[in-house]
């Protein structure tokens, strides 16, 4: 009896096995992502074909992949988890393009002058210069100032002075955060004002108009969120580099910071929307896997001038590029389901991006039947433009909401008995609120 009472009075000692110590100090996916990036920057400085280089490369690949199985960062914000998951896959695709399938210091060159064009030879740089060179290589997304500048970067007229450039960038930051605040509070207002299920206080016309407003808010609001993910770093960095003339030489020029998005005026077809209007941040490394696979084809197939061969190459490249983009975004839903302990989900991003590629193929076929050529700017008639705007916007808004936003919101565990459109609206609100540093929200006494 006394032994039993003594046993209950003595607290249980914690298990301090080696495995428990490792688990208690295990790294999160964020740590592995940072380690993989730092190792990628260091690898080009190691001698080629050396044991050191192979060892660093193996360690870098291990860290990049370990990020997908390590515990997600300790947060319950689904928008933050989604963004970090997309970032991990984005960087992995970047490594595939600029590290795994090439020798970076031999393949990628900074442009030191344009008239005539002169390229920097990174193999001749000392280690003190090659490390910053590699940091720039793995940081840039559109290849501005490099020999691999992506196509479709919007043309813009740079301000006449650095002070005007800095002012314009500061105003853009203010407008961006104010827009995010507006998206957040508008979503809050709509979510609070709409009736609960089972009530009928609006006619069909009012319901349709309300739904169209929500579609527009979801699509345009998330477009601003996507923009903010780039601008959050690019805008302050451009102010620092141009305003104070610091950083890489190419970054100190105002022309090195063109807009991320092209003109909506050019988006009168799906091909032009994705090729001209939408951002080019992923264009290089989403197309890299297809280009790598095509490099194994016989020369006769890769260089054939036959129409069937050219069309096959063109559309296979486009389809694979959209699939890779879908996989990158799918990593966000995968990360959310792991971080929140939800059933494993991959969202609907792959289906959505494949649908865009197939739609472009159908659109191209229709234009071919109607003898319409949209490849050149300025040749489309007024009727062609406005019919194109309506068709493109209608398809894009519907497919974006139903095949991308709704599945991602459901995979994030968002629930609303009023239906999936309200779930998508809540996802939009969370995404806008999750963008860090929103001083506009704080200024208006709104918690972001």
UniProtKB/Swiss-Prot annotation:
Organism: Aspergillus niger (strain ATCC 1015 / CBS 113.46 / FGSC A1144 / LSHB Ac4 / NCTC 3858a / NRRL 328 / USDA 3528.7)
Disruption phenotype: Loses the ability to produce yanuthone D, but accumulates 7-deacetoxyyanuthone A and 22-deacetylyanuthone A as well as two derivatives called yanuthone H and yanuthone I.
Entry annotated with the keyword Metal-binding: no
Primary role: O-Mevalon transferase yanI; part of the gene cluster that mediates the biosynthesis of yanuthone D, a fungal isoprenoid epoxycyclohexenone that acts as an antibiotic against fungi and bacteria. The first step of the pathway is the synthesis of 6-methylsalicylic acid (6-MSA) by the polyketide synthase yanA. 6-MSA is then converted to m-cresol by the decarboxylase yanB. The cytochrome P450 monooxygenase yanC then catalyzes the oxidation of m-cresol to toluquinol.
Keyword terms: Glycoprotein, Membrane, Transferase, Transmembrane, Transmembrane helix
EC number(s) given by UniProt: 2.-.-.-
Membrane topology: Multi-pass membrane protein
Compartment(s): Membrane
GO BP: terpenoid biosynthetic process
MF terms (GO), sorted A to Z: O-acyltransferase activity
Biotechnology: Yanuthone D is an antibiotic against C.albicans, methicillin-resistant S.aureus (MRSA), and vancomycin-resistant Enterococcus.
Annotated protein name in UniProt: O-Mevalon transferase yanI
Matching InterPro entries: Wax_synthase, Wax_synthase_dom
Carbohydrate-modified residues: 2
Pathway: Secondary metabolite biosynthesis; terpenoid biosynthesis
GO cellular component: membrane
Family affiliation: Belongs to the wax synthase family.
Enzyme kind, highest EC tier: transferase
Listed transmembrane segments: 21-41, 54-74, 79-96, 165-185, 217-237, 316-336, 350-370, 390-410
UniProt cross-references to Pfam families, sorted A to Z: MBOAT_2
Source taxon at top rank: Eukaryota
Location (main, coarse): membrane
């Amino acid at each position: 009896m006394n032994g039993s009472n003594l046993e209950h009075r003595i607290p249980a000692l914690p298990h301090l096995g080696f495995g428990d110590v490792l688990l208690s100090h295990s790294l999160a996916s964020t740590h592995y992502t940072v380690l993989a990036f730092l190792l990628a920057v260091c690898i080009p400085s190691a001698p080629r074909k050396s044991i050191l280089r192979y060892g660093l490369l193996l360690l870098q690949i291990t860290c990049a992949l370990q990020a997908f199985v390590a515990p997600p960062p300790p947060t319950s914000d689904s928008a933050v988890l989604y963004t970090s998951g997309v970032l991990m896959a984005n960087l992995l695709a970047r490594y595939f393009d600029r590290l795994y399938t090439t020798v970076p210091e031999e393949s990628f060159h900074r442009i030191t002058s344009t008239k005539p064009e002169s390229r920097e030879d990174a193999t001749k740089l000392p280690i003190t210069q090659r490390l910053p060179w590699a940091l720039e290589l793995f940081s840039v997304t559109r290849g501005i100032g490099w020999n691999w500048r992506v196509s479709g970067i919007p043309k813009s007229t740079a301000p006449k002075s650095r002070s005007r450039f800095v002012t314009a960038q500061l105003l853009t930051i203010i407008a961006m955060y104010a827009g995010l605040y507006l998206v957040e509070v508008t979503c809050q207002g709509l979510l609070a004002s709409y009736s609960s299920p089972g009530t009928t206080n609006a006619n069909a016309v009012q319901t349709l108009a309300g739904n169209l407003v929500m579609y527009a808010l979801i699509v345009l609001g998330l477009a601003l969120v996507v923009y903010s993910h780039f601008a959050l770093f690019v805008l302050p960095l451009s102010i620092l580099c141009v305003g104070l003339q610091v950083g890489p030489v190419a970054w100190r020029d105002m022309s090195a910071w063109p807009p991320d998005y092209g003109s909506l005026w050019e988006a009168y077809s799906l091909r032009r929307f994705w090729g001209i209007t939408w951002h080019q941040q992923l264009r290089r490394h989403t197309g890299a896997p297809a280009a790598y696979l095509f490099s194994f084809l016989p020369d006769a197939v890769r260089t054939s001038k036959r129409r069937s061969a050219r069309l096959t190459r063109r559309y296979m490249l486009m389809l694979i590029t959209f699939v890779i983009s879908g996989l990158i975004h799918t990593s966000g839903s995968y990360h959310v389901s792991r971080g929140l302990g939800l059933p494993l989900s991959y969202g609907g991003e792959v289906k959505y991006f494949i649908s865009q590629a197939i739609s472009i193929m159908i659109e191209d076929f229709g234009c071919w039947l109607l003898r319409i050529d949209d490849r050149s700017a300025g040749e489309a008639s007024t009727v062609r433009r406005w019919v194109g705007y309506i068709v493109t916007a209608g398809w894009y808004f519907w497919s974006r909401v139903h095949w991308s936003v709704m599945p991602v919101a459901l995979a994030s565990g968002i629930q609303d008995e009023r239906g999936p459109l309200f779930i998508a609206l809540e996802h939009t609100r969370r995404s806008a609120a999750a963008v860090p540093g929103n001083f506009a929200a704080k200024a208006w006494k709104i918690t972001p």
